[in-house]
Curated annotation (Swiss-Prot):
Ranges where the Acylphosphatase-like domain occurs: 4-91
Entry-linked Gene3D superfamilies: 3.30.70.100
Keyword field: Hydrolase
Organism: Geobacter sulfurreducens (strain ATCC 51573 / DSM 12127 / PCA)
Keyword S-adenosyl-L-methionine: no
Active-site feature positions: R19, N37
Enzyme Commission no: 3.6.1.7
The protein's name: Acylphosphatase
Molecular function GO terms recorded: acylphosphatase activity
Amino acid sequence: MKIRAIVTIKGLVQGVAFRHHTVQQAQRLGVSGWVKNLAGGDVQGCFEGEEEAVDALVAWCHHGPSRARVDRVILEREHYRGEFDDFDVRY
């Protein structure tokens, strides 16, 4: 089953290549969507794909790349919309 997830990652998640590594993980898992920095220092992403793949990407977000310190991940599950063909960084 395909799903959509909106995640907000809090902690030391900007300036540590979090977005770059999220793109790599999403491409490896076959997940589409986007990731972006938020003004307050958080990172937000929208992930779409097979439930198992999206869940794996969300699980990865709980620790992120080695230089990140993730304090909290806020997850909102939504119905799959099929909006994206690939995964990219939004600005």
